[in-house]
Structures are given as structure tokens and as C-alpha cells.
Amino acid sequence: MAALGTWLSSVRRLHCSVVARAGGQWRLQQGLAANPSGYGPLTELPDWSFADGRPAPPMKGQLRRKAQREKLARRVVLLTQEMDAGIQAWKLRQQKLQEERKKEHDLKPKGTLLRSPLPNQ
């Protein structure tokens, strides 16, 4: 009985060890998913098609993944639009500040103020 417990614990350690996840790093380096069932032709393409060549109707998992990708794409577009608007507003603000600084540093007329008569108080 004790030998069975030792054997089971060694099997559990082997199953949870680095050996079980060894291919994940290689798959990431090759541009694939860390998990082989994450994405790719095996999960994205239909499992079968009709004999006359029509594609099979999409499965629930395919529809769910498609909806997730569309949602992510919408969010990316929204965030890039917000970034573009923010950059444009920042550029306008910087341009206005630069114009104000330029006006501050312009030469000011001094002689005309001295020649004009003082207003009666």
C-alpha cells in the first residue's frame, strides 16, 4: 500500500512538472499558441464539410472565439482613436503655448507710450 502511495505521488509530480509544459516555450518562439488547443487551424477550421463542398456550420466554440476577437478588435480601434485624439489635442495645446511664448518675447513699442499725453485723472 505504501508503495502505491509513493508511486502515485511520483506520477503526480511528473504530471505537474516542467516536463509537462516543455513545449510551450518552443511554440511561443515559433509564433504559435503556448497551448496547442488555444488557436490555429485545428481549432479555427471546421472539423468536416459536406460532400458537395459546402462548409459545415460554425460550432459554438468558433462563434465564441469570433465574438471575442471582434470585441477585442473594437476595443483596439476605440483605444487607438482615443490616443489619436489625445495626441492631436496635445499638439494643439503645445502650439498655442509656443505662440504665447513667442508673443511674450516679441519686442514691445516703448517710444509711443512716452510721447502720448497722460490722460487727465
Swiss-Prot record:
Which portions of the chain have biased composition (kind: Basic and acidic residues)? Answer: 98-109
Biological process terms from the Gene Ontology for this record are: mitochondrial translation; translation
According to the lineage, what is the superkingdom?
Eukaryota
Show the Pfam families listed in the entry: MRPL52 (PF18699)
Any idea which UniProt keywords this protein has? Mitochondrion, Ribonucleoprotein, Ribosomal protein, Transit peptide
State the name under which the record lists this protein.
Answer: Large ribosomal subunit protein mL52
Record flagged with keyword Methyltransferase: no
Where in the sequence is the transit peptide found? 1-22
Q: How does it assemble?
A: Component of the mitochondrial ribosome large subunit (39S) which comprises a 16S rRNA and about 50 distinct proteins.
Q: Which GO terms describe its molecular function?
A: structural constituent of ribosome
Subcellular localization is given as: Mitochondrion
- Ranges where the record places region Disordered: 98-121
Q: Does the keyword Isomerase apply?
A: no
GO CC terms on record? Answer: mitochondrial inner membrane; mitochondrial large ribosomal subunit; mitochondrion; nucleoplasm
Q: Which family does it belong to?
A: Belongs to the mitochondrion-specific ribosomal protein mL52 family.
